From Swiss-Prot:
Binding residues for Mg(2+): 246, 248
GO BP terms: eukaryotic translation initiation factor 2 complex assembly
Protein name, per record: Translation initiation factor eIF2 assembly protein
PTM-bearing positions, type Phosphoserine: 60
Name of the gene: Cdc123
Length: 336
């Protein structure tokens, strides 16, 4: 994977070419002062939020108690920076897209920060909603600081013009999303995107799903993207129509889901792993999905919202911690 491959997967690089195949979006240049604010690792103070209501006369009885929590009357009040011009641009764009948007940077969306939002969703209606997600996201920080970390070439990093991408909010069903892997302009693999869950309809319709995705790829994407190796995400709606969601580089920076990158780069284990209906076709992609509830896994974003020890206990990944936890509970019961 080279740096130019990563650059070609920036939203603004591919959206003009495939606008008719995807969700309506608006791209706004990200001012330098906004970027600096998003990268500031100080206390999270979100711009654009209303001040909390002041205490009324009826609350005066709590004044003494509240005063005790103040270390120093001269303590500085944290204030959020304001970006009035940018805020106006963002709000106009949000309104033009129906009032709610899905935000992302050049490459990534703050999927790892959904837990911090009031609605536990990436649905945003204001700039402050976006700031809260962006400042809480490791994925966004990666876009800013290490976009070319897995690239093999030693050439200077391309100059990046950072952009805020606002996509019209659509209620997408996770079980209808798929990730597709293309090598040398050939579709070699398709994976269920939400691989942590079992969806009965995917197992029952996998031949039809695979055929729809192949037809979409051959008609709209094959030999038309900027590179011959790439990854693309699609959404198949209830009518069977396929929508393009995103492009990603063909390499370790992209989650391979139910495949491994060793399999995808060598293709050795993909031969013969075709759907039954396409068994005679040499170029049929391997199709993988979660086949039963037994193979359901924890969400990959779980670790971003909870302490690691909690995650290890809940998933059973650290046997020693689990044993210690059980011993602690037993001792507590004996003490009682």
């Amino acid at each position: 994977m080279k740096k130019e491959h990563v650059s070609h997967c920036q939203f603004s690089a591919w959206y003009p070419l495939f606008r008719s195949l995807t969700i309506k979006s608006v791209i706004l240049p990200l001012p330098q002062n906004v970027k600096d604010y998003l990268l500031d690792d100080g206390t999270l103070v979100v711009s654009g939020r209303e001040d909390p209501p002041t205490c009324s006369q009826s609350d005066s009885g709590n004044e003494a108690e509240e005063t005790q929590w103040s270390d120093d009357e001269s303590t500085a009040t944290l204030t959020a920076p304001e970006f009035p011009e940018f805020n106006t641009q963002v709000q106009e764009a949000i309104n033009s897209l129906g009032g709610s948007v899905f935000p992302k940077l050049n490459w990534s969306a703050p999927r790892d920060a959904y837990w911090i939002a009031m609605n536990s969703s990436l649905k945003c209606k204001t700039l402050s909603d976006i700031f809260l997600l962006f400042k809480s996201s490791d994925f966004i920080t990666h876009d800013f600081t290490q976009p070319f970390i897995h690239c093999t070439d030693d050439s200077p990093d391309p100059c990046i013009e950072y952009e805020l991408v606002l996509r019209k909010w659509c209620e997408l069903i996770p079980g209808a999303e798929f990730r597709c892997f293309v090598k040398e302009n050939k579709l070699i693999g398709i994976s269920q995107r939400d691989y942590t869950q079992y969806y009965d309809h995917i197992s029952k319709q996998k031949e039809e799903i695979c055929r729809c995705i192949q037809d979409f790829f051959k008609e709209h994407l094959q030999y038309k993207f900027l590179d011959e190796d790439f990854v693309f995400d699609i959404y198949r709606d209830s009518r069977g129509k396929v929508w393009l969601i995103d492009f990603n580089p063909f390499g370790e920076v992209t989650d391979s889901l139910l495949f491994t990158w060793e399999e995808l780069t060598s293709e050795n284990n993909l031969r013969g792993e075709v759907t039954e209906g396409d068994a005679q076709e040499q170029d049929s992609p391997a199709f993988r999905c979660t086949n039963s509830e037994v193979t359901v896994q924890p969400s990959p974003y779980l670790s971003f919202g909870l302490p690691k020890d909690f995650v290890d206990l809940s998933t059973g990944e650290d046997a020693h911690k689990l044993i210690d936890f059980l011993k602690l509970k037993r001792n507590e019961q004996e003490d009682d």
